[in-house]
């Protein structure tokens, strides 16, 4: 993500009313644009606040209250990335709101611009890895269950966090977001690297998700649909609808900016709002999937709903297994490797 992209779109100075020359005549911002920006900022603040609360609940249960497995480790790290992204956007939108509504011009610390880059790249990478793992478990089930290293999930997440942080810091330093050390050549270089990273993971996410869906619904040996597959499918779908536009916008920003003569009237805030919705929706998906066809007469705690959303056992098998019903954290399918 380029330094220009963040500074021009997120600094409070970018929202000052300006007059721009367009085809030889003067063009001034309309009240419609200002009203739209105010609405988008308020909605982004509200969604970010709600999303932080929901992701905090997921972090609490998965990090402390629940037994973790290969898949829940990824969900835990995805919730961390979403929480971090929403926190940074909440602070940035709040500072912009102070200027828009109260004309209080607060300079946003440049270091804060690095956090959305880091969090977005981490979330994208982790979600792509989730899709890849489930695809591998379908294509090579025996290898996945018997030969997969035990701590693959934790190690993979650690590597993705480190790589995303390193890329965010290097780009932030080169583009003047850290230490006020702008270098045009290295800024453009890291912009290209970041864009390549994003495009590769976009492609991997789409390809592995499509392969997974084809094997589930169209394969010669259809795979039983479990809550886990529903959770993954909905999470990927929500990202493609709400999260992907943010990545596409930053990749194409170098070209898009040439057509936006009036910065205040572009669509950045709408895209920012959609990205906040994406990070907010994941916990909602978990709880909704966990509550589907919940026929037992028992209290539906959030912990139980979250456990059921991660269930990798078909419903008919679960209903016939009383022991599994009493301990939903152990519902992950276990097969012999002999």
UniProtKB/Swiss-Prot annotation:
Protein name in UniProt: Mas-related G-protein coupled receptor member B2
Extracellular face of the membrane: 1-40, 111, 179-191, 253-268
Disulfide bonds: none
Species the sequence originates in: Mus musculus
Gene3D superfamilies hit by this protein: Rhodopsin 7-helix transmembrane proteins
CDD domains: 7tmA_MrgprB
Annotated region described as Disordered, given as residue ranges: 310-338
Family: Belongs to the G-protein coupled receptor 1 family. Mas subfamily.
Location of this chain's protein in the cell: Cell membrane
Gene ablation phenotype (knockout): No visible phenotype in normal conditions. Absence of pseudo-allergic reactions in response to small-molecule therapeutic drugs: secretagogue-induced histamine release, inflammation and airway contraction are abolished.
Function of the molecule: Mast cell-specific receptor for basic secretagogues, i.e. cationic amphiphilic drugs, as well as endo- or exogenous peptides, consisting of a basic head group and a hydrophobic core. Recognizes and binds small molecules containing a cyclized tetrahydroisoquinoline (THIQ), such as non-steroidal neuromuscular blocking drugs (NMBDs), including tubocurarine and atracurium. In response to these compounds, mediates pseudo-allergic reactions characterized by histamine release, inflammation and airway contraction.
Predominant subcellular localization, coarse grouping: membrane
The entry's keywords: Cell membrane, G-protein coupled receptor, Glycoprotein, Membrane, Receptor, Transducer, Transmembrane, Transmembrane helix
């Amino acid at each position: 993500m380029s330094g220009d992209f963040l500074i021009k779109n997120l600094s409070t100075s970018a929202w000052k009313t300006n007059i721009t020359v367009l085809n030889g005549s003067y063009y001034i911002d309309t009240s419609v644009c200002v009203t739209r920006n105010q609405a988008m900022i308020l909605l982004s603040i509200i969604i970010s606040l709600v999303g932080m609360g929901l992701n905090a609940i997921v972090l609490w249960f998965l990090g402390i209250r629940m037994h973790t497995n290969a898949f829940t480790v990824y969900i835990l790290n995805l919730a961390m990335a979403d929480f971090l992204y929403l926190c940074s956007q909440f602070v940035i939108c709040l500072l912009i709101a102070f200027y828009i509504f109260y004309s209080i011009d607060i300079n946003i610390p440049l270091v804060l611009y690095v956090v959305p880059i880091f969090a977005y790249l981490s979330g994208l990478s982790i979600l792509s890895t989730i899709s890849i793992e489930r695809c591998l478990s379908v294509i090579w089930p025996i290898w996945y269950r018997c030969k997969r290293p035990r701590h693959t999930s934790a190690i993979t997440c650690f590597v993705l966090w480190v790589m995303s942080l390193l890329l965010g810091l290097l780009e932030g330093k080169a583009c003047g977001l850290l230490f006020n050390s702008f270098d045009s050549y290295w800024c453009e270089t890291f912009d290209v690297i970041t864009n390549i990273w994003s495009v590769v993971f976009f492609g991997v996410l789409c390809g592995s998700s499509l392969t997974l869906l084809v094997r589930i619904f169209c394969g010669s040996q259809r795979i039983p649909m479990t809550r886990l597959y529903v959770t993954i499918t909905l999470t990927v779908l929500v990202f493609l609808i709400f999260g992907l536009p943010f990545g596409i916008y930053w990749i194409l920003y170098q070209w898009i900016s040439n057509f936006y003569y009036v910065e205040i009237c572009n669509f950045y805030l709408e895209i920012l709002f959609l990205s906040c919705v994406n990070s907010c929706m994941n916990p909602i998906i978990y709880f909704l999937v966990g509550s589907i066809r919940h026929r037992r007469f028992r209290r539906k705690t959030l912990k139980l709903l979250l456990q059921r959303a991660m269930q990798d056992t078909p419903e008919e098998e679960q209903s016939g297994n009383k022991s599994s019903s009493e301990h939903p954290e152990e519902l992950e399918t276990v097969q012999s490797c002999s």
